[in-house]
Amino acid sequence: MVESEDWLIVGKLVGAQGLQGELRVNPASDFPERFTTPGSRWLRGRKGGEPKEVQLKKGRQLPGKSLFILRLEGIDSRDAAEALVGQELLVPASDRPELEEGEFHLLDLVGLEARLHADEPAIGVVTDLISGGNDLLELKTSAGRTLLIPFVESIVPEVHLEKGWLLLTPPPGLLDL
């Protein structure tokens, strides 16, 4: 069995879709094949615990939304689907796609320090990544505030995974919200 620290959260089950047991998933992955290619996936309950293996039969993206619709083996009613809402969809960390030089996995940003200048102390730490039209970094400042920072190149021009920090060049007022 894969150890708990060796799992990647690739999505969260957020609702039932229709009456036939399909599930809506909010993705936490930039790789759509994690939701469309049949095969083994794992679910972990709202309170943690040991992941349970499930079989993805098929999946598709919901048109016009960032959500995916999944059909899991053995889940064939709305009630069965609703019982899974809130669980995390997992894959083994060993399933991470190989990246090119200079590329990184978005989930690797969590825990990085955020700096306004390379040679200055951090203003906070990235605590979460929120997927949407544009990904948002959730930043906890050293003053205890929580900020949402658009993860776009003009605002986050540099990411230094090996050094544990990223550079922010926010427009005026963004950090004051």
Curated annotation (Swiss-Prot):
Binds ribosomal protein uS19. The PRC barrel domain binds ribosomal protein uS19. This is Ribosome maturation factor RimM. Residues 101-174 form the PRC barrel domain. The keyword Hydrolase does not apply. It comes from Parasynechococcus marenigrum (strain WH8102). Disulfide bonds: none annotated. The gene is rimM. An accessory protein needed during the final step in the assembly of 30S ribosomal subunit, possibly for assembly of the head region. Essential for efficient processing of 16S rRNA. May be needed both before and after RbfA during the maturation of 16S rRNA. It has affinity for free ribosomal 30S subunits but not for 70S ribosomes. Keywords: Chaperone, Cytoplasm, Ribosome biogenesis, rRNA processing.
